[in-house]
Amino acid sequence: MSQLPLELGLSFNGGDILFQLLAMLVLLALLKKFALGPLLNIMKQREDHIAGEITSAEERNKEAQKLIEEQRVLLKEAKQESQSLIENAKKLGEKQKEDIIQAARAESERLKEAARTEIVKEKEQAVSALREQVASLSVLIASKVIEKELDEQAQEQLIQDYLKEVGESR
């Protein structure tokens, strides 16, 4: 096997290989100390920063979800309250409508009763006025028939008798 590199025109120098191996190890040690350490620290910091951002984002997301849920609850309560207010307003409107109708009916009945009372009163006044006119005419006719003037007491008695007759005939 030692003949193979010579046939190809390659020669190996053990010292060069050893020196290059040693230089490579020193270079790797220096890279590890001066480049890899800070690079790993930067990567660790970046990893920590990203993890912190993810955690922060998750917390903000949880808080946002919590706020959304609170808003849903508040919206649901507001809808229920508005529905309750609408129902109460409808009930109040119906009650006021019924109260107004009832008051209008009562006022109508009161006006009817007042009109009936007024009619009865006017009828009584008309009957009374008619009786007085009839009495006056009766006295006038009677006085012409008798051809004498009745005194006031006799006239009153005659009127009362006539009114009794008229009242009985009704």
Swiss-Prot record:
Disulfide partners: none
Highest taxon of the lineage: Bacteria
Alphabetical list of InterPro entries matching this protein: ATP_synth_B-like_membr_sf, ATP_synth_b/b'su_bac/chlpt, ATP_synth_F0_bsu_bac, ATP_synthase_B_chain
Record field: transmembrane: 20-42
Keyword Transmembrane recorded: yes
GO cellular component: plasma membrane; proton-transporting ATP synthase complex
Pfam families cross-referenced by the UniProt entry: ATP-synt_B (PF00430)
Assigned keywords, A-Z: ATP synthesis, Cell membrane, CF(0), Hydrogen ion transport, Ion transport, Membrane, Transmembrane, Transmembrane helix, Transport
Location(s) in or outside the cell: Cell membrane
MF terms in GO: proton-transporting ATP synthase activity, rotational mechanism; proton-transporting ATPase activity, rotational mechanism
Protein topology in the membrane: Single-pass membrane protein
The protein's role, per its UniProt record: F(1)F(0) ATP synthase produces ATP from ADP in the presence of a proton or sodium gradient. F-type ATPases consist of two structural domains, F(1) containing the extramembraneous catalytic core and F(0) containing the membrane proton channel, linked together by a central stalk and a peripheral stalk. During catalysis, ATP synthesis in the catalytic domain of F(1) is coupled via a rotary mechanism of the central stalk subunits to proton translocation. Component of the F(0) channel, it forms part of the peripheral stalk, linking F(1) to F(0).
Assembly with partners or alone: F-type ATPases have 2 components, F(1) - the catalytic core - and F(0) - the membrane proton channel. F(1) has five subunits: alpha(3), beta(3), gamma(1), delta(1), epsilon(1). F(0) has three main subunits: a(1), b(2) and c(10-14). The alpha and beta chains form an alternating ring which encloses part of the gamma chain. F(1) is attached to F(0) by a central stalk formed by the gamma and epsilon chains, while a peripheral stalk is formed by the delta and b chains.
Homology family: Belongs to the ATPase B chain family.
Protein name: ATP synthase subunit b
